[in-house]
């Protein structure tokens, strides 16, 4: 009788273990289904951002090719810019949430965890690539718009240097150079384009600053992802090159007071931040090796 009781107890324990394993498997399957659903949603958002970036590039070209762009074109661009920011913030938050959950499960090494890490890394890299293209398109549009302003000023008989033009853009007041323009039909058209391009650049710079903040956040998000370090380091190096060029231009403009001095301070702060990020990346790269 005693042996029979032990057999029944052992059988019951085995059944309980089997039940626990089934419950764990079911829970894990449900969790991974939810994870892949989030991955797909995030991937679709990144693809949509990529489409919007291509549309924005087309609108940039249209605006640059027309002396006085249609208001609807600018409205369409404004809507696209808003949509890109909205989706980009959504993607960033999703990736950060995924990273948090991965860190919480880091103590448990499993095939599922490796899959989640891999998917997170792929999406992060794709997101950086898309947003880098957007940043490049914005910077290109700004430079070409600035060139159009410079040419229109020359038409009116006012020649300006790059430093003087940057001073005008930072002041937010095109009247610094447009005041006193001869009252002729050609000058009026040129003046209208100058003011329009100036407004475009002011709006664009606000977006570029927001994008810069997002890039800093992304850099923190992917800093421990091995191969992602090379991509971020490359992006930072390109940015540093642009900042170094701007700093050299600022040195030549030291004679200007007020806004020019403010510009130098801003550039120095940006350089320090970027060099700090670059140092962090190099340190992490050495650590990973």
Curated annotation (Swiss-Prot):
Which InterPro entries is this protein grouped with?
A: SNARE (IPR010989), STX3_SNARE (IPR031186), Syntaxin (IPR045242), Syntaxin/epimorphin_CS (IPR006012), Syntaxin_N (IPR006011), T_SNARE_dom (IPR000727)
- Output one GO BP term: positive regulation of cell adhesion
Q: Which molecular function GO terms apply here?
A: SNAP receptor activity
Give coiled-coil spans as residue ranges.
32-111
- Expression (tissue specificity): Expressed in the retina (at protein level).
Q: Which residues lie on this side of the membrane: Cytoplasmic?
A: 1-263
List the record's Gene Ontology CC terms alphabetically.
Answer: apical plasma membrane; azurophil granule; cell-cell junction; dendrite; glutamatergic synapse; lamellipodium; melanosome; membrane
Q: Which residues cross the membrane?
A: 264-283
Specify the t-SNARE coiled-coil homology domain's residue ranges.
Answer: 191-253
Phenotype on deletion? Knockout animals show progressive photoreceptor degeneration. At 5 weeks of age, an approximately 60% decrease in thickness of the outer nuclear layer (ONL) and in the number of ONL neuronal somata is observed, indicating that a large number of photoreceptors have died. In some of the remaining rods, rhodopsin is appropriately localized to the outer segments, but a marked amount of rhodopsin mislocalized to the outer plexiform layer. At 8 and 12 weeks of age, increasing cell loss and further ectopic expression of rhodopsin are observed.
> Mind listing the UniProt keywords for this protein, alphabetically?
Cell projection, Coiled coil, Membrane, Neurotransmitter transport, Transmembrane, Transmembrane helix, Transport
Q: Where in the cell is it found?
A: Membrane
Q: Which residues lie on this side of the membrane: Extracellular?
A: 284-289
A Pfam match is SNARE
Describe the subunit structure. Interacts with REEP6. Isoform 3B interacts with PRPH2 in rod and cone photoreceptors. Isoform 3B interacts with ROM1. Isoform 3B interacts with SNAP25. Isoform 3B interacts with VAMP2.
Q: What family does the entry list?
A: Belongs to the syntaxin family.
- Entry function: Potentially involved in docking of synaptic vesicles at presynaptic active zones. Apical receptor involved in membrane fusion of apical vesicles. Essential for survival of retinal photoreceetors.
Q: Which PANTHER family match?
A: SYNTAXIN, SYNTAXIN-3
Protein name per the record: Syntaxin-3
